[in-house]
Amino acid sequence: CEHGCVYCFARPSHAYLDLSPGLDFETKLYAKTNAAERLRIELAKPSYRCSPIALGINTDAYQPIGRRYRVTRSLLEVLAECRHPVSLITKNALVLRDLDLLVPMAERGLATVYFSVTTLDNQLAAKMEPRASAPHARLKAIRALSEAGVPVGTMVAPVIPMVTDRDLEAILEAAYDAGARAAGYVLLRLPHELKE
């Protein structure tokens, strides 16, 4: 994931490709350019049962590389066409690019967006999440989505004991003030490869 979050639990997934969970994880990126085509095939199967799809669970749905490849947008186009529910999780204000798809989907109860906010401290965020949108940009995006009618929530993720746990209430208040109406959290979990 291009955001390069130092605490990311997904870093070891790069080992599957014989790459390092360190710098390789955020610099050797793979775009699934056929994802929309594959999704359309899966949704068309007679055995498929409609259930909300979550994008951005393992790696962010709106990485900077997404400006070029637009994989998430192509997936949203298929989901909108099929009237299929989706939830997005991101740390990037790039999600606003897809308002034209998200608003009509939200009007049908088909789309929600969650913003992961770890801290409101811009300097700390820049160290921990170097290529994710700054916390204030995420809050502005929450406001823009909410004002456009897209249901928005916030994930305080991860909560890092002794580092970001003191920010929990402030994050929830700021997100609520911006328009988030749901919240959750995830405690820090470091795979063995990251503990060192």
Where are these regions (language model features)?
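Surface-exposed cleft-lining segments at the edges of enzyme active sites
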Residues: 123-131, 157-160
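Short, hinge-like loop/turn segments at secondary-structure boundaries
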Residues: 105-107, 131-132, 171-173
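Active-site mouth loops of central-metabolism enzymes
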Residues: 64-66, 128-129, 161-164
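Conserved C-terminal portion of the radical SAM core fold
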Residues: 136-194
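Short, well-ordered secondary-structure micro-motifs
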Residues: 99, 126-127, 165-166, 195
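TRNA-binding/sensing appendages of the translation machinery
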Residues: 1-3
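Conserved Radical SAM active-site core
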Residues: 6-114, 118-126, 135, 139-140, ...
